[in-house]
């Protein structure tokens, strides 16, 4: 057979193989979608079976014996005998495991590792024990995401996903168990490293780049490979919105080096990891002067609006979490993406993976997550945002099963996991938005107890976010917007006051700062007062009663919040899970922020307050 005929036959064979895999993928999609329907139709029955299975497999655990379960696996005994707990309640057991005690403390199955919290959940890294087969449950939930997405966005098997994914170097507990973020655990697992080919889940980033603990080398390689494959990219994403913005910032800083590598067909000497160099060499197979010139032309314009769709023109959506605290980044992502849809696909934490968004292309403000009943046993603690906090020694409110959730009510999620956490308060506040079959759907409201407080006032993350958004509208006429913010309750003044740190971005052609310096100061002072007007009645009452001082805005120079993130990562935070803290109290972070302040502004008057209005 002639060489050309051989090549054609090989190409045809490969095409047939790909087509066959695509057909198989469609069949798997149908099976996965039916699985979702089956689980959600029989939600409460599945929950009862899951609880019985958890209690049966852990009936030899010291924790369940201590609380008198005595091998019982029924829901009634469990609720009557096992208490609702927080991390502090479980700390003694967790420390025993971390220090090397291998007895069946909370689980009859061996604890294989600890999953660390992000480092920004109430300011504390927590160690969450997990077991080997938990990876199977996480993988199962991941396997449901694309079948749902394919209902809304066709043709995703015809291209690739540009995802910026990272790990961090893990630590060991005194007893020798790994302690690492949940995504680091997953990316380093065989489930991820040896995943079978799936035409709907092809990444531009080499696995070697994702698994590199050096953040610069990892980002550089992932960005370079993403640029080389620009025509094939159909979706762009990261775990959190902040991670995707960090990638755009990286492109702004390093596009010249990236273009040089593309032009010469060589990889920068700054990337020294051999496995990355080998992987990138396969992607960067030959010089591409045309692509290099394109990168230089687009990035050299200093016009970054719509840069994502300019660099990756076939992108159909952004795959990022933009709920909760990440909602802050929606305007900036719209700016850089040219208004692409943003898909929030799943809801998970270090403690447990919970569920998925069955309408992933909905507006970010409408995102609701459907809880999958096979992931763990879930209960709800009623939460009244207007009620005074309970005393620490007060019994918690009576919990309700998810099947009995009321639409419109807010609840705190309480979980029981296969790894041995029993009736554990996660700290997430959720609002019931409806049901899919018998499964409740929730909007993520906020993390509990992320507060500013000077006197009797308590301002949570959602209130602070709303106040910042209201004040930022005053900057819009000048082409300025808030890139990032955080806050602190400054008790060094008498009375104490709220301090809010803003980092600004000015769009091309914007009129900021105003020509008159005095006008600029006036705008910021109005922003201070606008924020105060948006805060709750207790705060405004305190201001009028001089129990709280005027709110202060401190404007910081560009890049400050990247420095804050770099500092957090240097202290062990995960680059994947990092979220800029909305309230800070850690001295070195406050010192860093204050050292970058370029101007300070105070509210010029007290906000309106009436005891008869909220």
Swiss-Prot record:
GO terms for molecular function: acid-amino acid ligase activity. Expressed in roots, flowers and callus. Keywords: Ligase. InterPro entries: GH3 (IPR004993), GH3_C (IPR055378), GH3_M (IPR055377). One of its GO terms (biological process) is response to light stimulus. Its EC number is 6.3.2.-. The keyword Ligase applies. Induction: By auxin. The keyword Cytoplasm does not apply. GO terms for cellular component: cytoplasm. PANTHER family: GH3 DOMAIN-CONTAINING PROTEIN, INDOLE-3-ACETIC ACID-AMIDO SYNTHETASE GH3.2-RELATED. May catalyze the synthesis of indole-3-acetic acid (IAA)-amino acid conjugates, providing a mechanism for the plant to cope with the presence of excess auxin. Belongs to the IAA-amido conjugating enzyme family. This is Probable indole-3-acetic acid-amido synthetase GH3.2. It comes from Oryza sativa subsp. japonica (Rice).
């Amino acid at each position: 057979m002639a060489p050309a005929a051989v090549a054609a036959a090989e190409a045809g064979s490969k095409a047939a193989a790909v087509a066959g895999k695509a057909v198989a993928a469609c069949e798997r999609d149908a099976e996965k979608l039916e699985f979702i329907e089956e689980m959600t139709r029989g939600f409460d029955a599945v929950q009862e079976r899951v609880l019985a299975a958890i209690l049966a497999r852990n009936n030899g655990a010291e924790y369940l014996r201590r609380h008198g379960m005595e091998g019982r696996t029924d829901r009634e005994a469990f609720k009557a005998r096992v208490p609702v707990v927080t991390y502090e309640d479980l700390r003694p057991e967790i420390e025993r495991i971390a220090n090397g005690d291998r007895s069946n403390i909370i689980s009859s199955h061996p604890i294989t590792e600890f999953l660390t919290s992000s480092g920004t959940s109430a300011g504390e890294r927590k160690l969450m024990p997990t077991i080997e087969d938990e990876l199977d449950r996480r993988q199962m939930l991941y396997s449901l995401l694309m079948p749902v997405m394919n209902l809304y966005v066709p043709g995703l098997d015809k291209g690739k996903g540009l995802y910026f994914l990272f790990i961090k170097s893990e630590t060991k507990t005194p007893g020798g168990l790994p302690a690492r973020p949940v995504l680091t655990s997953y990316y380093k697992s065989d489930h991820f490293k040896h995943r079978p080919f799936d035409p709907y889940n092809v990444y531009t980033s080499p696995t070697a780049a994702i698994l590199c603990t050096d953040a610069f080398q990892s980002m550089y390689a992932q960005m370079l490979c993403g640029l080389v494959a620009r025509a094939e990219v159909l979706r762009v994403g990261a775990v959190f919105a902040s991670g995707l913005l960090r990638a755009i910032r990286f492109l702004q800083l390093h596009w010249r080096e990236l273009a040089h590598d593309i032009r010469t067909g060589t990889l920068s000497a700054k990337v020294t990891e051999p496995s990355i160099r080998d992987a990138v060499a396969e992607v960067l197979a030959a010089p591409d002067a045309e692509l290099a010139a394109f990168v230089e032309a687009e990035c050299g314009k200093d016009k970054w609006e719509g840069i994502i769709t300019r660099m990756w023109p076939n992108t159909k959506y952004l795959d990022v979490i933009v709920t909760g605290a990440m909602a802050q980044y929606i305007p900036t992502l719209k700016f850089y993406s040219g208004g692409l849809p943003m898909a929030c696909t799943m809801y998970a934490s270090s403690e447990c993976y919970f569920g998925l968004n069955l309408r992933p292309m909905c507006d970010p403000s409408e995102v609701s997550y459907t809880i999958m009943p096979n992931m763990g046993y879930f209960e709800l603690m009623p939460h009244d945002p207007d009620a005074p906090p309970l005393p620490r020694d007060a019994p918690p409110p009576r919990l309700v099963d998810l099947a009995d959730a009321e639409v419109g009510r807010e609840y705190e999620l309480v979980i029981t996991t296969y790894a041995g956490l029993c009736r554990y308060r996660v700290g997430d506040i959720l609002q019931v938005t409806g049901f899919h079959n018998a499964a409740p759907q929730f909007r993520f409201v906020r993390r509990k107890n992320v507060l500013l407080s000077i006197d009797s006032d308590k301002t949570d993350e959602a209130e602070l976010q709303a106040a910042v958004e209201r004040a930022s509208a005053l900057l819009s006429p000048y082409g300025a917007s808030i890139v990032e913010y955080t806050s602190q309750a400054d008790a060094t003044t008498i009375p104490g006051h709220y301090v809010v740190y803003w980092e600004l971005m000015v769009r091309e052609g914007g009129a900021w700062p105003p020509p008159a310096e005095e006008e600029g100061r006036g705008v910021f002072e109005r922003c201070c007062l606008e924020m105060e007007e948006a805060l709750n009645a207790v705060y405004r009452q305190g201001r009028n009663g001089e129990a709280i001082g005027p709110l202060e805005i401190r404007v910081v120079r560009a890049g400050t919040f990247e420095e804050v993130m770099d500092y957090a990562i240097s202290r062990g935070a995960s680059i994947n899970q990092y979220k800029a803290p909305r309230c800070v109290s850690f001295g070195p972070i406050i010192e860093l922020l204050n050292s970058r302040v370029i101007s300070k502004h105070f509210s010029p008057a007290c906000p309106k307050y009436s005891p008869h209005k909220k």
